[in-house]
A protein has these predicted regions:
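Aromatic-lined carbohydrate-binding surfaces of glycoside hydrolases
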Residues: 4-215
Length: 215
């Protein structure tokens, strides 16, 4: 047998993009093999973002959106990683309800396996990415439209709710509570506020306020 000791206690693995290549089409057989491979290679903190659309469905419903509006806000499965990174909305959608439901059951299996191997899954949290209807429902909220990404048309651009706004904290709490109800938690979360997109402002003070609000 070969034994290698890591220099650090925790080893984080994966990023949002890796969930957008072949992973959208993985079933449990692929995931089980991959999780076992991660365990053999000393991964302790795998990113685990599968199934979050069901959580968002419940959150956005509570704010008055219809199921049709919510599923049309999501992209299709092949582009969902970039929707989760706040790059694009709606492209190749709406997201099928059957796919959303199946991903919940898959995520439960993923998390059970990872935790059984002493891993601490890193779950998603709210980055400020909201459907366009939220700006109509809450006209006074600090919501801005994200500038273009990768040449996608204006209809696919995202909206960003500033973490300094009280609505951000309300949505964050609602999301984490529902996610914990569905999937449990290891109290470790990953949030990428501006992935390949422009921040509303590059003023250092504003960026500091955004970071504090998200944290």
């Amino acid at each position: 047998p070969v034994r290698v000791e890591a220099r650090v206690k925790e080893r984080f693995f994966l990023n949002y993009c890796t969930f957008g290549y072949t992973m959208p089409w993985w079933g449990w057989n692929e995931w089980e093999r991959f999780i076992d491979w991660m365990a053999l290679n000393g991964v302790t903190m795998p990113l685990a973002i599968t199934g979050q659309e069901a959580v968002w469905q419940k959150v956005w419903r509570s704010h008055g959106l219809t199921d049709e509006e919510i599923r049309s806000y999501f992209t299709g499965p092949a582009h969902l990683a970039w929707h989760r990174m706040s790059n694009i909305d709606g492209f190749d959608g709406p997201l099928p309800q059957g796919w959303i439901d199946a991903q919940v059951e898959l995520q439960k299996k993923i998390l059970e396996r990872e935790r059984s191997l002493n891993m601490k899954p890193v779950l998603p949290a709210f980055s400020g990415h909201v459907p366009s209807q939220i700006k109509e429902i809450y006209p006074s909220a600090q919501i801005t439209r994200v500038k273009g990404w990768a040449g996608f048309p204006e209809e696919n651009l995202c909206h960003f709710l500033a973490p300094m706004d009280s609505l951000y904290h309300r949505i964050q709490r609602e999301f984490l509570e529902e996610q914990t109800r569905l999937f449990g938690t290891d109290h470790i979360y990953g949030v990428d506020l501006f992935n390949e997109v422009e921040a509303p402002s590059w003023d250092p003070q504003t960026l500091a306020e955004i970071s504090r609000g998200a944290y």
